[in-house]
């Protein structure tokens, strides 16, 4: 079961990072301008962020395996569409389709893990989930660099998308045999009005985060944020009212009465604000500041992966020993890693030894491996099975919004520092200082989230 579920998780996470390596070659071949390039990246993220809440609820109502299979098939076809795209318009459409498919899969995978496993098996399942996410994130750039340099069958950048085809086909073949169907036990009614409201609100919130920095934060971005606030307010009021009238809201307000879930969502947003922006500024520093090729910069990422693999493969054992301190300890270890990286960047500069970055990268990877999967498990620990899909959709949305927010904020910090100093090392260190603050805030939130409860083998706080 885990192998099939993680195939989809791996593909969707990989495509977030691997596309960054493919962009230069893609732009040259398809004659894509800056706006088109931005949409190749942003179209995927926007579709995921706006679709996961609705997809989570659809899984509760109509079957999580069924929705996962639909998403997996659509993602595989969309990858084919991207891989054979004759022009930039088709490629952007394929990326949006990939995002919608990822939105279908992501909450179903989390919901199935949360309902199919209990006790230590549940902790191990979430450890595998975290390991898969981390490996895709950390090694995505390396995998992309290898594929492009290998230029298999003359496919070049297209192989970064076509690599999903055999993975998707195999997972689809095994899915009916290995993954049981599951669904919520609540009222089988679909909240159409709630779906429309939350989708519009997320578009209004995420679109300016994605495009605001490059556009110079024009008036429309601030008007969009204001519209998002109004739409979210209307959505919350409608959900509460619908629940009181005996209806079936898209997101049951009871979910947020659990302190673990509501505070955990905030922690997830802040955590992913740091993760998405860290990978971005590190790649910029290595490729633009040090002039490394995508493949060579991907090799540097192996240092993070080494640390991550050490702790993520034994995350449930660490949780059993450290209890409620597991995630806080992981985030504080990440702070230490970023501080070491800040010092190492001062020595590496633009022409010094890149090896000066390695100690900080390893320590950051160790902390990331300790924090990622136990944090997800903690947030979902108190969710009733009937709400598993909706809760997983909300959690996935928090991750996407955090990532978009992180990229927007780090863009302001990094590029302002770059403009002021003219040097990538200074801009990178300014970005790291921002990330250290983000991780300290994350540590404070997860300390509060622990709330004095001890984690056992199940990963519960």
Describe the role of every protein-language-model region.
Residues 1-21, 30, 221-222, 231, ...:
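12-transmembrane solute porter fold
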Residues 1-173:
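Transmembrane-helix bundle of Major Facilitator Superfamily
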Residues 74-84, 97, 101, 167-174, ...:
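Transmembrane-helix signature of multi-pass solute transporters
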Residues 149-266, 274, 292-293, 299-300, ...:
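Hydrophobic transmembrane-helix bundles of small-molecule transporters
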Residues 107, 133, 137-145, 202, ...:
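Glycine/proline-centered helix-kink
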Residues 25, 57, 61-62, 84, ...:
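Membrane-interface helix caps of multi-pass small-molecule transporters
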Residues 46-50, 80, 134, 138, ...:
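Hydrophobic/small/kink-forming positions within alpha-helical transmembrane segments
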Residues 28-29, 35, 60-61, 83-86, ...:
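Membrane-helix boundary and inter-helical linker elements of multi-pass secondary transporters
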């Amino acid at each position: 079961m885990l192998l099939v579920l993680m195939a989809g998780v791996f593909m969707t996470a990989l495509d977030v990072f691997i596309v960054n390596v493919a962009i230069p070659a893609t732009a040259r071949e398809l004659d894509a301008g800056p706006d088109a390039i931005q949409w190749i990246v942003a179209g995927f993220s926007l579709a995921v962020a706006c679709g996961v809440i609705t997809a989570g609820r659809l899984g509760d109502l109509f079957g999580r395996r069924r929705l996962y299979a639909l998403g997996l098939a659509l993602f595989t076809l969309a990858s084919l569409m991207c891989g054979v795209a004759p022009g930039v318009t088709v490629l952007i459409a394929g990326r949006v389709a990939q995002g919608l498919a990822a939105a279908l899969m992501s909450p179903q995978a989390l919901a199935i893990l949360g309902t199919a496993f209990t006790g230590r098996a549940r902790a191990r399942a979430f450890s595998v989930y975290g390991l898969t996410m981390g490996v895709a994130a950390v090694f995505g750039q390396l995998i992309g660099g290898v594929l492009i340099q290998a230029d298999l069958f003359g496919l070049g950048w297209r192989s970064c998308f076509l690599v999903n085809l055999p993975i998707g086909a195999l997972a689809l073949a095994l899915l009916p045999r290995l993954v049981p169907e599951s669904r919520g036990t609540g009222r089988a009614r679909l909240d159409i009005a709630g779906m429309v409201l939350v989708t519009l609100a997320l578009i209004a919130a995420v679109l300016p985060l994605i495009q605001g920095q490059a556009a110079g934060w024009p008036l429309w971005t601030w008007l969009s944020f204001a519209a998002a606030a109004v739409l979210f307010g209307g959505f919350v009021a409608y959900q509460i009212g619908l629940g009181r009238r005996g209806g079936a809201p898209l997101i049951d307000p009871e979910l947020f009465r659990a302190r673990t879930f509501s505070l955990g969502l905030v922690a997830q947003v802040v955590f992913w604000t740091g993760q998405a922006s860290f990978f971005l500024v590190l790649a910029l520093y290595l490729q633009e500041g040090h002039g490394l090729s995508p493949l060579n910069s991907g090799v540097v990422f192996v240092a993070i992966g080494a640390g991550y693999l050490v702790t993520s493969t034994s995350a449930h054992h660490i949780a059993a020993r450290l209890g409620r301190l597991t995630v806080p300890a992981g985030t504080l270890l990440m702070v230490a890693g970023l501080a070491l990286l800040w010092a190492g960047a001062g020595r590496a500069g633009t022409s010094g030894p890149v090896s000066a970055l390695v100690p900080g990268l390893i320590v950051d990877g160790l902390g990331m491996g300790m924090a990622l999967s136990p944090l997800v498990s903690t947030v979902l620990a108190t969710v009733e099975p009937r709400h598993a899909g909706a809760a997983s959709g909300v959690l996935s949305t928090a991750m996407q919004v955090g990532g978009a927010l992180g990229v927007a904020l780090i863009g302001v910090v990094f590029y302002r520092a770059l403009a002021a100093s003219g040097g990538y090392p200074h801009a990178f260190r300014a970005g790291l200082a921002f990330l250290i603050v983000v991780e300290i805030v994350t540590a404070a939130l997860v300390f509060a989230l622990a709330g004095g409860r001890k984690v056992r083998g199940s990963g519960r706080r």
